[in-house]
């Protein structure tokens, strides 16, 4: 019923699949990919465009893992494959070793690009790399906090970056906490001094930074 409802109300739906179904993966709950696979079939049948999202980490960055997910997406008529960079935030804060370096990300991007170009299949999903993944034309190190995105947590906290969360899903640093919608409107929060720290100046990612890097007024 939910798939039919979505099919009549939204254009596309995206789900996370870091590894193929039934393949163990320590960064996700058991059967996570199995549930995504079931949803893909139901949503395609309901007429939705369907995308898969893979969060690339040191635990799933091998050629075999990438090829398996891409081949599954091809075989199941997935429309889009998005590849994001892993950040040790939220539940992932317990796995800092899963974080890939810029060089590892760039090598992974090139590997996937070559794999997609060379795989002889009839249907291929569009492949979209996250802007913080070096090695492709959309890559930029410029932070998008507040200027392009924010996060709103279940308790009403508004954070400048939805990756800036600790293992208890609180802001990793006070500078990322902009306010709470229980006490102020979202417009008031986004016009506030803490938000202007991010919106008034262009700067690079400050996740894991003990001090603010050089910033420039844009």
Task: Show which residues each predicted segment covers.
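Radical SAM/AdoMet-radical enzyme domain recognition
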Residues: 1-85
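A C-terminal junction/extension of Radical SAM enzymes
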Residues: 49, 86-164
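Short clusters of hydrophobic/aromatic residues that line enzyme substrate/ligand-binding pockets
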Residues: 24-27, 100, 143, 178-181
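Short acidic, glycine/proline-rich loop/turn micro-motifs
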Residues: 24-27, 92-96, 171-172
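Flexible, glycine-rich phosphate/dinucleotide-binding loops
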Residues: 22, 59, 89-90, 165-168
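Short, solvent-exposed polar/charged micro-motifs at secondary-structure junctions
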Residues: 1, 62-63, 93, 134-143, ...
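Generic alpha-helical structural signal
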Residues: 37, 67, 106-113, 187
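Flexible mid-to-C-terminal extensions adjoining Fe-S/redox cofactors in radical SAM and related proteins
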Residues: 157-158, 162-218
């Amino acid at each position: 019923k939910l798939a039919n409802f979505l099919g009549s109300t939204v254009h596309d739906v995206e789900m996370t699949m870091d590894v193929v179904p039934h393949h163990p993966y320590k960064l996700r709950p058991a059967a996570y990919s199995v549930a995504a696979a079931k949803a893909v079939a139901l949503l395609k049948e309901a007429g939705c465009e369907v995308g898969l999202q893979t969060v690339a980490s040191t635990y799933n960055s091998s050629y075999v893992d990438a090829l398996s997910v891409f081949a599954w997406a091809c075989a199941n008529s997935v429309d889009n494959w998005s590849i994001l960079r892993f950040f040790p935030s939220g539940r992932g804060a317990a796995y800092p070793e899963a974080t890939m370096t810029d060089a590892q990300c760039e090598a992974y991007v090139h590997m996937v690009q070559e794999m997609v170009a060379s795989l002889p299949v009839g249907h291929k999903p569009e492949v979209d790399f996250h802007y913080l993944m070096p090695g492709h034309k959309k890559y930029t190190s410029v932070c998008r906090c507040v200027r392009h995105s924010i996060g709103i947590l279940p308790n009403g906290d508004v954070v400048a970056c939805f990756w800036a969360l600790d293992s208890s899903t609180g802001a990793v640093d006070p500078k990322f906490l902009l306010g709470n919608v229980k006490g102020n409107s979202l417009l008031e929060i986004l016009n506030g001094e803490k938000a202007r720290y991010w919106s008034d100046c262009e700067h690079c990612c400050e996740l894991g930074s003990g001090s603010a890097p050089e910033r420039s007024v844009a």
